[in-house]
UniProtKB/Swiss-Prot annotation:
Transmembrane segments: none annotated. Disulfide bonds join C55-C114, C227-C228. PANTHER family: C-REACTIVE PROTEIN (PTHR45869:SF7), C-REACTIVE PROTEIN-RELATED (PTHR45869). It comes from Rattus norvegicus (Rat). This is C-reactive protein. Gene3D superfamilies: 2.60.120.200. The gene is Crp.
Amino acid sequence: MEKLLWCLLITISFSQAFGHEDMSKQAFVFPGVSATAYVSLEAESKKPLEAFTVCLYAHADVSRSFSIFSYATKTSFNEILLFWTRGQGFSIAVGGPEILFSASEIPEVPTHICATWESATGIVELWLDGKPRVRKSLQKGYIVGTNASIILGQEQDSYGGGFDANQSLVGDIGDVNMWDFVLSPEQINAVYVGRVFSPNVLNWRALKYETHGDVFIKPQLWPLTDCCES
């Protein structure tokens, strides 16, 4: 009986550290500047990517630059990076090189962000609250690597680490979904209003994650929706 109870305690502890759950209407909250607060995510798909779409909500309260979404491999720490640079705007990196979408200031309200890229053309898209920015091109012919370390709240300057508090997010992140293809404009707008098209890399409704440091799970602050998954 004692051995059974010990095994049960280990199982409970493991399930709390490595969640795999429906995060609907919840958000990760990063309440302060830190080099130790972050969330690591485990991808459902382990294969190389010839295209991707990442969508999420972000609500930040910092006047400096910060990381929004960091996807590192052992050969490229900025394999995929979504980053806000103060006074410049949003940048999207693929395989190291990055491209900038100009903006004078970060929105003060929760913002829905979608970033897409495809290897065949190198076309990069950035959507903010269902509205597209001008398309740009980056890393045509590149293939995004496997065995990724995916981090929310920090930028990785090494695989799974190398964090800098001056690049940390202070605020909320939620509704994080990722696909291994480029969503159509109609699909991106549908995701913005609450529908989800079977994410096959990261799925907010069946998320594998681990929190580190002062990160909390709280109800989301952006509009609630009751749309069903397609």
